[in-house]
Amino acid sequence: MIEFGNFYQLIAKNHLSHWLETLPAQIASWQREQQHGLFKQWSNAVEFLPEMTPWRLDLLHSVTAESETPLSEGQLKRIDTLLRNLMPWRKGPFSLYGVDIDTEWRSDWKWDRVLPHLSDLTGRTILDVGCGSGYHLWRMIGAGAHLAVGIDPTQLFLCQFEAVRKLLGNDQRAHLLPLGIEQLPALKAFDTVFSMGVLYHRRSPLEHLWQLKDQLVNEGELVLETLVIDGDENTVLVPGDRYAQMRNVYFIPSAPALKKWLEKCGFIDVRIADVCVTTTEEQRRTEWMVTESLADFLDPNDRSKTVEGYPAPQRAVLIARKP
């Protein structure tokens, strides 16, 4: 059983304590009514994993845990098998005692693009919205964050996160809650808020920006990473039924348009930090994610377009501040 008591105890003593007015009831409701049909199977995989204490832990350059002496073949096989029960693994990679999880996304590449543009994370309390398996939560801790909280309603991601946590010595500096941003009160408590790969899935993107702003302290920093298209501040793509085979893509603005949206929502010091095309080296099929990936979503005769004829995915990072 995945429990959240440690997180409740942690925030009871800090500036997030007012979250306890709503959070435990939301989690209890989720545990009673909303669990996925495979959740028991996934949580059993976490339960059967050994709790390991790394001899060497690197969260600064990667997410890597090593033991002082190599694990036996049987120990490695047990860990490998249990982690494979949590497939597909989309966000990573992770290297855990000789088991290398080669995820669909090279999320480390994204982190390397984002990190140079951030304010120093040392001592910060961070929220990562739509955090997936929590890979970037661990990298935030590696960069000096005091506490990294992720929210993502996808229950497989919660189990993947808890599996990794167990293999990292039950580290309590990062936590993942099975919630969406719309379930959070206006906490106004986080020094940095990340929203990476979420905005284009929102029916109302400006409402999402307001929700992110409501989580920040005054002078807090927003890190927004999302799909963009080429164009000026008035350019926005509204795809038809699908974009790159995804049904739930609503608005893809240009980077200048997105900057304008952020300013309209009251953010200041907005800057476009990075724009890059997503490659099939960064997002691809692996033995840990065996279904279709980016290469299958692009026009085989023109890789600059999706199979639907839209511009191929490119992603921008924008940094902004709440006044």
Swiss-Prot record:
CDD domains tied to this protein: AdoMet_MTases
Protein purpose: Catalyzes carboxymethyl transfer from carboxy-S-adenosyl-L-methionine (Cx-SAM) to 5-hydroxyuridine (ho5U) to form 5-carboxymethoxyuridine (cmo5U) at position 34 in tRNAs.
Alphabetized Pfam families for the sequence: Methyltransf_9
Enzyme class, first EC level, given as a word: transferase
Keyword Aminoacyl-tRNA synthetase: no
Phenotype of gene-disrupted mutants: Deletion results in tRNA having 5-hydroxyuridine (ho5U34) instead of cmo5U34.
Domain of life: Bacteria
Top-level taxonomy: Bacteria, Pseudomonadati, Pseudomonadota, Gammaproteobacteria, Enterobacterales
Keyword Metal-binding included in the entry's annotation: no
Stated name of the protein: tRNA U34 carboxymethyltransferase
Family: Belongs to the class I-like SAM-binding methyltransferase superfamily. CmoB family.
A GO biological process held by the record: tRNA wobble uridine modification
Disulfide bonds: none
Subunit comment: Homotetramer.
Catalysed reaction, written as an equation: carboxy-S-adenosyl-L-methionine + 5-hydroxyuridine(34) in tRNA = 5-carboxymethoxyuridine(34) in tRNA + S-adenosyl-L-homocysteine + H(+)
GO molecular function: methyltransferase activity; transferase activity, transferring alkyl or aryl (other than methyl) groups
Record keywords: Transferase, tRNA processing
E.C. code: 2.5.1.-
PANTHER family noted in UniProt: METHYLTRANSFERASE (PTHR43464), TRNA U34 CARBOXYMETHYLTRANSFERASE (PTHR43464:SF95)
UniProt-annotated binding residues for carboxy-S-adenosyl-L-methionine: 91, 105, 110, 130, 152-154, 181-182, 196, 200, 315
Entry-linked NCBIfam families: PRK15068.1 (NF011650), tRNA 5-methoxyuridine(34)/uridine 5-oxyacetic acid(34) synthase CmoB (TIGR00452)
